[in-house]
């Protein structure tokens, strides 16, 4: 326990910077690279033995003591389980006892600091900075105001109208454009040819098509690209910035009958580009759950993935004001698997823990509190990156215990070469706690394990993109059986305002199509995918969908066929726009100027 951290500790455990209110002793990166005395002694003994030439490698290891044998065994595991001895010749080591191959690697990155990705400014500096901004706000009275995400409830077409006219004219002047686009009542209408390929002699209903459209450059301005009801070929809806777009095309029955004899031909689809400005993603938090009570959004009570028969790790919790610093030891990891294409694949690793506050007088988090965790911590094994973070937490007030789980995220692929023995034995994270009422959006689990995007890390980023989140594949998705797959993630949310998430395609994705749908609070997230060919495999960790915040409306996109078109309805002197059975909220889809 008195030795300095070993090299294995450096490579396998990410060090999280403690809060400034409780500073820990700093250890330089050079000190961390120095071997403990036991390893140094073993290295000297090995050098002397090689000069005399009397001891074999096995005798050297036996004489080194159990501590050194364990460290060498860990080094062998860290190198992917390769044998470190051949016959009677030990693996060559550098002068400081580190394997030569590993020493060369460390020499190349010796100037790097693994803590740079986790370093934050001191809390008193941040507090002073915020107070200075408030003082500046008073001086700026009557001028501009600092932006708040929630204050704007709707966008206005008049802010973009001249720009939309400009990009329409720019599109029409291109030499390769044969069908001119027109800007009418806030939308861009255009016609585009679709190649119909029936060389195999049997008509089919689904196809794939690429189209080129006007392109927007504003960060918050997108388009809903879809077909109108006059189209014989219906392009399935996309959320796009414009430019080159790929989507699934659907032919109606009449078009299929008329095109049976045609081998290769052209059909035209009538397209509309509806300006779309999503809401900025609000600040989020995850409520603390309590035993026996339903979680956020109707999620099951307790901790997600908790297994009473599995061993618990031990967590010690230190309170620093509104921040909880958690140190977890003795973790036992459980692999979660799914059967895909006839093979069981690892989807993630999960470990559970429980423990108490270090200070018996410190208060436990209450039911009305919520938390935001520190960022995902990166680990590496055999050159493969994966990330780990806290998943869910439960407070047992009667036992004064904190129960929870840590898990690998879906944002990276978990290789089959990684086993539970390679997972970190200890972990650390911090929680920023505050009252639930201060957050409009509350998830049932840590969204950082499921999504990526600037909106999850706004306080740490300069000019973040707060208009979208990216969903990643939770496992390898095979399309060998059928071209349509639905992926379900056990994640729910509750939102106080009348907003929800729009599940949409990835920009410029042409290998598969993501069906447009609405994800409402209290429901698990479902993503429906189509592929062009059945030989495509989407690896775990691949982005598969994009989430946008919109004002909640009626209906949803329930089917993806020739009825999924843009249409309008007139009633009581008002016009309402629909995409299939989904009503388009006027706050986000700008089809006409707001009064």
UniProtKB/Swiss-Prot annotation:
Sequence segments annotated as region (Disordered): 47-94
Taxonomy, superkingdom: Viruses
The UniProt record lists the keyword Signal: yes
Cell location: Host cytoplasm; Host nucleus
Pfam families, per database record: DUF570
Main subcellular localisation: host cell
An annotated GO cellular component: host cell nucleus
One Gene Ontology term from the biological process aspect of the record: symbiont-mediated suppression of host innate immune response
Keyword vocabulary terms for this entry: Host cytoplasm, Host nucleus, Host-virus interaction, Inhibition of host innate immune response by virus, Signal, Viral immunoevasion
Endpoints of the signal sequence: 1-40
Record's compositionally biased regions (Basic and acidic residues): 68-82
Quaternary structure note: Interacts with host CGAS.
Role played: Plays a role in the inhibition of host innate immune system by targeting host CGAS and promoting dissociation of DNA from CGAS, thereby inhibiting the enzymatic activity of CGAS.
Family: Belongs to the herpesviridae U10 family.
Name of the protein: Protein UL31
Organism: Human cytomegalovirus (strain Merlin)
